[in-house]
Amino acid sequence: GEKNMAAEPLYKASEETLNLPEKWAVSFADSLSYPEFKENVPADTLCCVQEISGWEKKAGTLRFEGSIRMDEAVHAELDLGEVFEIAEVFVNGISAGVRLCKPYRFDLKDLLVQGENQIKIEVTNCLGTALRDPISHYLMIEPFGIEGPVTLKKHSQNSDLEAGR
């Protein structure tokens, strides 16, 4: 019988997981200073501001910067897992897109090259963590940043589409 190609994804994530940067530089910009980032701190993982001393009440944009080396150009998907709230991913200065809600997945086709690759992730939240009115004092403050789990998986093209079937 005929196969419904519209129901098949063009690319399927393989089980091959690629390495993420081992170290990240985290910086912050509020709505007035963006795109100028300040207050740089190092981090071993992508995280939420609640894990950075003194940053607990920040509202604005967090920038995570790291680099990874590739032996060859690859087609991969970056899945950020849980993010609070808006995420944009850049690879080598090119935006891979913006996500406002789950799933926080980014197709990195044609972005990861052989050699060194600069990864930049910007996460923006609303002013709720910084400005507290009388009613919001009783509401739970959501985290700000990336809770994960974060994965980078190599893609393999759907063989049926590749063969034109």
Question: Which positions does each model-derived feature cover?
Answer:
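An acidic-aromatic loop/edge-strand motif
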Residues: 1-61, 94, 108, 112-165
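Residues that flank catalytic or metal-binding motifs in active/ligand-binding sites
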Residues: 20, 64, 85, 102, ...
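Surface-exposed coil/turn segments at beta-strand junctions on protein surfaces, enriched
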Residues: 57-59, 71-73, 82, 99-101, ...
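Short beta-strands within extracellular/lumenal beta-sheet-rich domains
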Residues: 58-69, 104-106
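Aromatic-lined ligand-binding clefts that engage carbohydrates, nucleic acids, or primary amines
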Residues: 68-92, 119-122
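Solvent-exposed beta-strand/loop surfaces of large extracellular or lumenal domains
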Residues: 84, 90-106
